């Protein structure tokens, strides 16, 4: 809700809808009746936030990942031809890993948390996909510190849940506020009409008019 309140503070009267499904992968949405729900709303801007669950699968297949995003955006655009897409990258997360440790001469197996090595691949795949198609992307992973420090920054700030995958309310609130501020900033800096931007990755401007409705996955 922090994204909604941040946008409404700048653009009063904007309508915001949220279609999140906890634990869902991107392909869940184009196989689901979610496309019909989005079409019924007919949003001006659709924020697509995937990546954390994809990063917890096996090694990323970049071609399959791009195909999934293509199918999703194509099926939405068939129903909403004027919609603008804004992708976001995942914030970063940890994996549980079994290791052996020797204590008092006895070898024991224990579980430790390690930074998820798949997140950079997923984030880079999303950024590359948007660059190639001139779609907007907000690179939260890089903003948070990237491969070197995104995960530790979130954890050390006390914003992550104990599973080190999900976030506390304060963490999600911060992410929503940052995204809302980025959208407002991109609009304020817009210079040319009718173009989508790679937010935080270049100066290509957004469409120079306020959005009336925003939807988010």
Feature locations, PLM:
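Conserved SGNH/GDSL esterase-like catalytic core that processes O-acyl groups on lipids
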Residues: 1-71, 78, 94-96, 166, ...
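Extracytoplasmic/secreted proteins, especially bacterial periplasmic and envelope-associated proteins
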Residues: 2, 33, 60, 64-75, ...
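Sec-exported extracytoplasmic/periplasmic mature domains
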Residues: 8, 39, 51, 74-81, ...
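Active-site proximal loops enriched in glycine and acidic residues that flank catalytic Cys/His/Asp
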Residues: 20-23, 49-52, 87-92, 139-142, ...
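Conserved, well-ordered alpha-helix/loop/beta-strand core segments that scaffold catalytic motifs
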Residues: 47-51, 73, 84-89, 124
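Extended hydrophobic-aromatic, low-complexity segments
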Residues: 57-58, 84-88, 96-99, 148-149
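Catalytic His-Asp segment of secreted/periplasmic serine-dependent ester chemistry enzymes
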Residues: 93-217
């Amino acid at each position: 809700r922090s994204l909604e309140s941040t946008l409404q503070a700048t653009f009063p009267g904007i309508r915001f809808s949220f279609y999140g499904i906890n634990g869902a992968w991107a392909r869940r949405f184009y196989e689901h009746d979610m496309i019909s729900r989005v079409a019924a709303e007919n949003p001006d801007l659709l924020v697509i936030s995937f990546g954390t669950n994809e990063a917890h699968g096996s090694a990323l297949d970049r071609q399959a990942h791009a195909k999934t995003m293509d199918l999703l955006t194509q099926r939405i655009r068939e129903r909403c031809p004027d919609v603008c897409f804004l992708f976001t990258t995942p914030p970063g997360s940890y994996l549980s890993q079994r290791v052996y440790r020797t204590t008092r001469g006895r070898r024991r197996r224990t579980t430790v948390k390690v930074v998820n090595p798949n997140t950079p691949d997923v984030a880079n795949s999303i950024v590359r996909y948007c660059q190639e198609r001139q779609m907007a992307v907000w690179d939260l992973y890089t903003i948070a510190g990237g491969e070197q420090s995104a995960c530790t920054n979130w954890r050390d700030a006390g914003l992550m849940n104990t599973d080190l995958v999900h976030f506390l309310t304060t963490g999600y609130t911060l992410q929503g506020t940052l995204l809302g501020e980025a959208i407002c900033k991109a609009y304020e800096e817009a210079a040319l009409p009718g173009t989508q931007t790679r937010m935080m990755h270049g100066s290509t401007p957004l469409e120079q008019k306020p959005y009336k409705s925003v939807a988010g996955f």
